[in-house]
Amino acid sequence: MLRKSKKQPQTVAEKVSKLLAHPNESDSAEDSDFDVATGPRLVDFEEEEYDLPDARSTDFRKRNVKLLSEQSDRYKGKISSRKELDDDEDKDDEQEVSYEESDEDDENLTNFKQKLNAGGAEDSEEETAAGHSESGEESEEIESNLTDFKKKFEAGDFKYDDDEEEDDDSEEEDHSQESEGDDDDSEDDEAEDDAIKPSDVMSKTNHQAEIQKGLAVQNQLRIWERLLELRINTQKFTSKANQLPAPETLTKLASESDELQSVLNEAQERSSKLLQQLLSLQSALHQQYSEMKKSVKRKQPTEDSGPAVKKFGSVLQSNFQQMIGYRNEVLLKWDDRTKLLTPGAGVKRKSLQEDYDIIKKIGSALANREALVEKSQTPKNSQAEQQENTPVQRLKHIYDDSDFYHQQLRELIEYKASTSSNMSEITKQFVELQKLRQKMKKKVDTRASKGRKLRYVVHNKLINFMAPNESSDWTDASKSELYKSLFV
């Protein structure tokens, strides 16, 4: 059994009266549920639960932010002393005193007006009480003079205020014009700063440092020329040494002749003395150069029992092993610097081998060591061992590097031909170098980021590979009937 609702139904009159008394309320449960379901839901805000995000600036922004003084000259400060600061304070005090005096002057003017008005009234009362002792014309003149004076005074005061306002307006206009002029000047200055000329860049550099770099480069070139000159002078006796017989035949001839033995001993002593001097020079250079002294750790050579030639060989081998690390660092450093000056440095390489550094290139060149040694032990056409009809033979007791020697000579000739003291040619080379550097710079469109510029690729036109659809009114039956009628 369902229970009957205890709530009695309301009449129409009761509903209308309730709506008139409370128009915003609804008595039905359905309306209230509808309002709850469709009405806006509000959540209480609690400050403790809500945490603001961390809006601190990053280190990158701090480093790249520009001060106002760097952006425009208007915001640059001026260095002042304490004396100037005290003078400014005294000027401010004087201005305050002048303002106070002007207030006192205004009060005096008002008092003077009141006295004039009071004096005029008293004079008129005395004249009437005396029974018109003076003539009416004089009294009228006095009154007219007083009224004229009052009018002139008031008119003069009004004009003075107008002049002040006009002066203030003119000063404001002048100030606005000056500020606009300053803005224009600042914009012009900023535009001039943005358009930096190459001469300005060259003038801002440290000339003394550039001079020192130029002198260092000249010293390096002189050292290279002296070493190449030494190599040219040694070419004569190296070619003569390669013409000597093999060591076995030379020892056999020396055993037969005492004079030849003494000559060989003297040559060995002189060559060993020369080699000793070169090693001492190398150690002195290591001690003199601080960077090499830190990078190259010298080891004391072990005393080997044996002939002097073997001792020299072990010392040279140990020195070479110690210098490998420093040599690679120097080669990589200068190879990276010279890559920027070579033409076509910014162009993509066709092969992966061209992207190798200088160390990998040297390693790949020395990979086939046996072939290189055989090439250096093969006599060339300029030597006497090789005759016209005899085949080329490998002689292990000689060392021929004429290919490398001729390459060095070609480099020396090209360097002497390219270098000149004429300033016009030097400026032309400098301009060509600047053009080359500008070409190597990658042109980047700064406005194309963040989706501000659409990037698209134009596709080729569509090609239709379908068979053509014939639009003909003839049916197959009519076509076959036509073909049959042709061969009747």
Curated annotation (Swiss-Prot):
Q: Does the keyword Phosphoprotein apply?
A: yes
One biological-process term from Gene Ontology? negative regulation of programmed cell death
Q: Which residues carry this modification: Phosphoserine?
A: S26, S28, S32
From what superkingdom does this record's organism come? Eukaryota
Q: Where is this region: Disordered?
A: 71-206, 290-309
- This protein's record includes keyword Phosphoprotein: yes
Q: Which GO terms describe its cellular component?
A: nucleolus; nucleus
Query: Where along the chain is composition biased (Basic and acidic residues)?
Result: 71-85, 148-159
Main localisation, per the record? nucleus
Acidic residues bias (residue ranges): 86-108, 160-193
Which keywords describe this protein according to UniProt?
Answer: Nucleus, Phosphoprotein
Locations listed in the record: Nucleus
Family, according to the entry, reads as follows: Belongs to the AATF family.
What is the annotated role of this protein in its UniProt record? May function as a general inhibitor of the histone deacetylase HDAC1.
What is the recorded name of this protein? Protein Aatf
Can you name the source organism? Drosophila melanogaster
